Design a protein with these regions (language model features):
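Extended acidic/charged loop-beta regions that coordinate divalent cations
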Residues: 1-41, 78-93
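Conserved phosphate/anionic-ligand binding catalytic regions in large, soluble enzymes, centered on
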Residues: 50-56
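ATP-dependent carboxylate-amine ligase
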Residues: 37, 43-48, 60-70, 74-236
Length: 236
């Protein structure tokens, strides 16, 4: 709101969308439309920063397209980023009282955004399941686990279904290098096979824990997670 470019744009009476406290505000001249973040489920009361940014972009696009504000509000309040609406985009699930998050992030910027989001959620012991895209630069693959190593207690590395030109085990080796001297991570494990890695992480979870699963085979991995969570719910 107070950024010089934004302030100038607003002072000139142009359209702006910005965050003001716990709300997203659309403004034009003296006119205002306020949307409370508590009414937008995907932001978790404004705690998930990248979702707040997504909401701002959505509001701006819908406003620019001329949609009625009632329609915009209804869309924001009713949208749920589950595996059906937004597969692999911060899909939250419950597994025996633990929080499981599935995401398709595969670059350092995504890791930073995910860590910031996870930090805003409750969680006792925190674990992450990760592979790496072989067609990225070595330093980008390493940097992902440098970031994760400061935020998670346990890291499970698994080898992608497609190595994208990398040799066997090469990506996992780069990921492990990024964990050297990690500030928080105390346990690292390498596993061949995405679903085996997921099952290993799930089987260790206790109520109140949190696990971030960075999926590779999006549809198949989400279906596997949904099945495991459903089975856990029936067993409970």
């Amino acid at each position: 709101r107070h950024h010089p470019v934004m302030a100038t744009h607003r002072a000139q009476g142009h359209r702006t969308v910005y965050v003001d406290g716990d709300s997203v505000v659309a403004a034009e001249g003296s006119w205002r439309e306020t949307i409370h973040l508590r009414d937008v489920p995907i932001t978790r009361n404004g705690k998930i920063g990248f979702q707040v940014e997504n909401v701002m972009a959505s509001v701006a696009a819908a406003w620019g397209a001329g949609l009625p504000w009632q329609t915009i509000r209804r869309g924001l309040s009713g949208f749920v980023n589950d595996s059906d609406n937004a597969p692999g985009r911060f899909n939250l699930m419950d597994f025996k009282g633990a929080t499981v998050i599935a995401d398709y992030g595969h670059n350092p910027d995504a890791m930073r955004a995910l860590v910031a989001a996870v930090d805003a959620l409750p969680g006792n012991r925190r674990s992450v399941v990760i592979s790496g895209a072989g067609d990225r630069r070595d330093e980008d693959i390493r940097e992902q686990t440098v970031i994760l190593g400061a935020a998670f207690d346990d890291v499970i590395l698994y080898q992608d279904a497609a190595q994208r030109g990398r040799g066997d085990g090469e990506v996992m080796a780069l990921l492990r290098e990024g964990l050297a001297g990690a500030a928080r991570t105390r346990h690292v494990e390498e596993i061949r096979g995405e679903f085996i890695a997921i099952d290993t992480a799930l089987d260790r979870l206790q109520p109140g824990d949190l696990c971030l699963v960075l999926v590779d085979q999006v549809e198949e991995a989400l279906a596997h997670l949904a099945r495991r969570c459903a089975e856990a719910g029936v067993a409970a």
